[in-house]
């Protein structure tokens, strides 16, 4: 009775029961009885299984062609279905079956301009809520999802294509996104193209661009080039790729090359002497304009325009990645990144495996995740993350043995995996990865077995700090000399620590948090290699075992961990001048035993994903 006042019975007749009153008083709150009437016991119940089980049964009915009331004819394929299911999932079908269209009365409906297999996949999704987007179907699946107005599948296809972006295909993906009005994918493809222009200009796709799209690209202020010479060379290569067709378009395209920003030597010696430039009056005029700009600095304020505006400098900054770990009683695969320029934590692509006790480091601007524990098994697999594509790859060779609570660092172009445990014993084994050979090789073992060890690289040496020998936490420290392939014992820490955080900051090694024999630690200390001594540093505000430690844009940051009671997502930053730690926001996920890594990224890169 929407919109009408509620009426309640207050006159209870002699001998009436609560049910009598309820049936007589048909208006009012049906769940509330009048005063004086005993309230019956109630237990609201919502089934989590019901939607899934109902969908499973309806899908079985479809497969057995039971209660189907429509047949979709797509090419040579006939697909049996239920109008109500199609209408519930697709605005396209809802309009078709509930309006006055002829199809609303037909039992067979012909669907044109759609791929048979794509339609099958989308109908399967309507009945199962599951679909697999892959390289072989995305180009037919996205147009089909657009036609049927399945926004969720459109987003999934675009997300898949975002992860496939590469300098060799970004222009094709951009055109595909433009055709199907995928604005977010178009934006990201544009950003990717601008940032990777030096590689994109070498691709076949670049050479096949129509003139208007080439102009769109080279007109961008955010084009990432070392100098305007690269833009000019790219344009001339594009023209000469199909010279008869494109020669007349050269003046139009050259207008968007910022010739006044070229060096005088290049402008005169290369641009001005090029036969294609010399033979065209409009091109010669553009060269003369640039010469005047360079030769008459006093007149430059009067000559400002799009061609004299410098490309925006590409700002570089460091971005912190938090990888895997243990959260809410289970290993996790999630990864997030912190950008100091925006002061924001954002989720990025997850690893293919859950990893706690994972070793993380950065080599050649790629983030490596080594070993760990997935909640049931010890791992020797390795994954590699490319921030340019927001994609993890698993084609990295595995370590020779399973390792969790492993220390990982980069020295001399190699990735080192130090210690850890394999599920049977604590390890002193050390091996290093050569990315050129995709191969791990054993090097000298440590003198002590160490799990929960922290590692750092300083002065050409690899340091293994603390950890546990499988029985007790350690305060001992070893240093590896790659020239000698030997480990040497150095001064011990003041405190025994396992599962600590370690990083190099201001030419000293900082060791923070961890756990001793009895409790999680908030204390910190640092090592001076010049004196071979450890000295105490002010304690963090929280106890943190399984903490990550990293230096980001000159700031020492302690990330996550466990305080003895709670998994932490908070961050602390060390202020060396004030000799204090201060809280600095928090991650999206609580993380114990996760890894951290820092990658220097351009401003453009850091805002793509």
From Swiss-Prot:
Transmembrane segment boundaries: none
Q: Where is the BACK domain?
A: 170-272
**Which SUPFAM superfamilies does the protein's record reference?**
Kelch motif, POZ domain
Q: Which compartment or compartments is the protein found in?
A: Cytoplasm, Perinuclear region; Nucleus; Golgi apparatus, trans-Golgi network; Cell projection, Axon
The induction annotation reads: By hypoxia.
Which ranges carry the BTB domain? Answer: 68-135
Does this UniProt record's set of keywords contain Mitochondrion?
A: no
One GO BP annotation is: protein ubiquitination
Q: Which PROSITE patterns match?
A: BTB
Entry GO CC: actin cytoskeleton; axon; Cul3-RING ubiquitin ligase complex; cytoplasm; cytosol; dendrite; Golgi apparatus; perinuclear region of cytoplasm
Q: What is the effect of changing residue 148 to A?
A: In KLHL20m6; abolishes interaction with CUL3
Q: Which GO terms describe its molecular function?
A: actin binding; type II interferon binding; ubiquitin-like ligase-substrate adaptor activity; ubiquitin-protein transferase activity
Pathway note: Protein modification; protein ubiquitination
Please report the residue spans annotated as repeat (Kelch): 319-365, 367-413, 414-460, 462-507, 509-554, 556-601
What would changing residue 109 to A do, according to UniProt? Answer: In KLHL20m6; abolishes interaction with CUL3
Protein keywords: Actin-binding, Cell projection, Cytoplasm, Golgi apparatus, Kelch repeat, Nucleus, Protein transport, Repeat, Transport, Ubl conjugation pathway
CDD domains according to UniProt: BACK_KLHL20, BTB_POZ_KLHL20_KLEIP
Q: What does this protein do?
A: Substrate-specific adapter of a BCR (BTB-CUL3-RBX1) E3 ubiquitin-protein ligase complex involved in interferon response and anterograde Golgi to endosome transport. The BCR(KLHL20) E3 ubiquitin ligase complex mediates the ubiquitination of DAPK1, leading to its degradation by the proteasome, thereby acting as a negative regulator of apoptosis. The BCR(KLHL20) E3 ubiquitin ligase complex also specifically mediates 'Lys-33'-linked ubiquitination.
Q: How does it assemble?
A: Component of the BCR(KLHL20) E3 ubiquitin ligase complex, at least composed of CUL3, KLHL20 and RBX1. Interacts with PDZ-RhoGEF/ARHGEF11, DAPK1, PML and CORO7. Interacts with F-actin. Interacts with IFN-gamma (IFNG). Interacts (via kelch repeats) with IVNS1ABP (via kelch repeats); this interaction blocks the assembly of CUL3-KLHL20 complex.
Q: What is this protein called?
A: Kelch-like protein 20
| Source organism per UniProt | Homo sapiens (Human)
């Amino acid at each position: 009775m929407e919109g009408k006042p509620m009426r309640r019975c207050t006159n209870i007749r002699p001998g009436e029961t609560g049910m009598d009153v309820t049936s007589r008083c048909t208006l009012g709150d049906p769940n509330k009885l009048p005063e004086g009437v005993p309230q019956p016991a109630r237990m609201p119940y919502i089934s989590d299984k019901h939607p899934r089980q109902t969908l499973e049964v309806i899908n079985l009915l479809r497969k057995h062609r039971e209660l189907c009331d429509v047949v979709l004819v797509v090419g040579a394929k006939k697909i049996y279905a239920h109008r109500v299911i199609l209408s519930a999932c697709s605005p396209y079908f809802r309009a078709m079956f509930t309006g006055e269209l002829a199809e609303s009365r037909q039992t067979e409906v012909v669907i044109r301009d759609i791929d048979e297999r794509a339609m099958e996949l989308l109908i399967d999704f309507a009945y199962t809520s599951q679909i697999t987007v892959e390289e072989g179907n995305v180009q037919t699946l996205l147009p089909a999802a657009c036609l049927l107005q399945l926004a969720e599948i459109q987003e999934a296809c675009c997300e898949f294509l975002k992860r496939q972006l590469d300098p060799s295909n970004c222009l094709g993906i951009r055109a595909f996104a433009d055709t199907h009005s995928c604005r977010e994918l178009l934006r990201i493809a544009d950003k990717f193209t601008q940032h990777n222009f030096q590689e994109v200009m070498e691709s076949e796709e670049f050479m096949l661009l129509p003139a208007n799209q080439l102009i769109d690209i080279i007109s961008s202020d955010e084009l990432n080039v070392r100098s305007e010479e690269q833009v000019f060379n790219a344009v001339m290569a594009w023209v000469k790729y199909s010279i008869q067709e494109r020669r007349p378009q050269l003046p139009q395209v050259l207008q968007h090359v910022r010739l006044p920003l070229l060096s005088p030597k290049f402008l005169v010696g290369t641009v001005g002497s090029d036969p294609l430039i010399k033979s065209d009056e409009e091109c010669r005029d553009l060269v003369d304009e640039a010469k005047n700009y360079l030769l008459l600095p006093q007149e430059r304020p009067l000559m400002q325009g799009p061609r004299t505006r410098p490309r925006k400098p590409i700002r570089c900054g460091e971005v912190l990645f938090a990888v895997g770990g243990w959260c809410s009683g289970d290993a996790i695969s999630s990864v997030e990144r912190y950008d100091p320029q925006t002061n924001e934590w954002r989720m990025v692509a997850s690893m293919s495996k859950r990893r706690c006790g994972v070793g993380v480091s950065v080599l050649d601007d790629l983030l490596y995740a080594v070993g760990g524990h997935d909640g049931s098994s010890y791992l020797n697999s390795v994954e590699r993350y490319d921030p340019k594509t927001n994609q993890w790859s698993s084609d990295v060779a595995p370590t020779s043995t399973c390792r969790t609570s492993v220390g990982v660092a980069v020295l001399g172009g190699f990735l080192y995996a130090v210690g850890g445990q394999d599920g049977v014993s604590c390890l002193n084994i050390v091996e290093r990865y050569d990315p050129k050979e995709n191969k791990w090789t054993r090097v000298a073992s440590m003198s002590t077995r160490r799990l929960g060890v922290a590692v750092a690289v300083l002065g050409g040496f690899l340091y293994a700090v603390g950890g546990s020998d499988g029985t007790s936490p350690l305060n001992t420290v070893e240093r590896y000399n790659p020239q000698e392939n030997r480990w040497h014992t150095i001064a011990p820490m003041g405190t025994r620590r396992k599962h600590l955080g370690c990083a190099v900051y201001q030419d000293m090694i900082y060791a923070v948090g961890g756990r001793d024999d009895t409790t999680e630690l908030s204390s910190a200390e640092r090592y001076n290699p010049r004196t071979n001594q450890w000295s105490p540093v002010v304690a963090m505000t929280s106890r943190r075992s399984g903490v990550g430690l990293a230096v980001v844009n000159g700031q020492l940051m302690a990330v996550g961990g466990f305080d003895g009671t709670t998994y932490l997502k908070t961050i602390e930053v060390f202020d060396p001048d004030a000799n204090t730690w201060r809280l600095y926001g928090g991650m999206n996920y609580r993380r114990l035993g996760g890894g951290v890594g820092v990658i220097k990224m351009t401003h453009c890169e850091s805002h793509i994903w």
